[in-house]
Amino acid sequence: MIKRAICLLAVLFSLPAFASELNESIQTDYDEHLGALFDHFHRNPELSTVETETARRMALELSLAGFDVTEGVGGTGVVAMMENGEGPLVMMRADMDGLPVEEKSGLANASRAKQKDPITGNDVFVMHACGHDVHITSLVGTARHMAAHRDEWTGTLMLVVQPAEERVLGARAMRDDEIWERFGKPDYALAFHVASSGTAGVINVQEGSPYAGADTVDIIIHGVGAHGASPHRGKDPIVLGSQIVLALQTLVSRELSPRDPGVVTVGSFHSGTKHNIISDRAHLQLTVRNTSEATRQILLDGIVRIAENMGRVAGLPEDKLPEVIISNESVPPVVNDAPLVRRLRAAWV
């Protein structure tokens, strides 16, 4: 899969040429350099905001390819520029952070890396479980191919290595660090994401919104603690939380049009410390996905309405109703530029 993915960005700006020559060039670079580089990245993932070694290696690779490299943009972000005559400024972006997941694949290049989680402070296993190792390896492959074929294109190429995509922090941090003012605002911006459900070697591109917007939501439930043998003396936050989880399932199925995509997923439910104690608190963690602002508002408003009113049903006073916290870690849907999509399709076909 990595071999095919490396082809993607290199193909985007190749002028008409024999496909076999392009494939042969990419295969050679994969065999001689990129394959080992991918293994290195996969074995050595780093968590969001602390991708220091990954950023350092990416800066080195892009510099060796002939790009002017700036490190530390928006934290650990990297920007690499190559000017090649008159033409548009084209940005290609790849994300580089891993996830706090223990890899159990048993593969030769499996990650056994551990790192201190900047959120919890705990040492956790880290894995490239979302394909970002493919993305950054592909960006290096693109850089090397474009630098070696400068006679086939003109303009300015901006390669962006984005940190903290998984925490929805990196793009904002690079923007706040004035990436556009310092390096120029691109005429075209390109990125891709691998998909395990797709067919290897196939590039999928569509007009409209291929990737949904996302919100991170927390629900804090304030119950009344009691002994497990005397539940009538308390307000059980686990029961209330369970009722909220079930009620949330109606938001997509009964409040959205069947033609309007949306997702409300409860990914975490934490409460209690012991078998025979009814806790006084529960914490739900949700992800909410949408492809339009109208859908987003329906879902977020519905979460607040359900959580608060289920608290009322349970008999909680108004000042103890469940709290709904909508994080600033949110992103809008990706909306592809239709003319650019058509242009790319024509080039690939």
Summary of predicted features, one role per range:
Residues 20-128, 133-155:
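Acidic/His- and Gly-rich active-site-bordering loop/insert found
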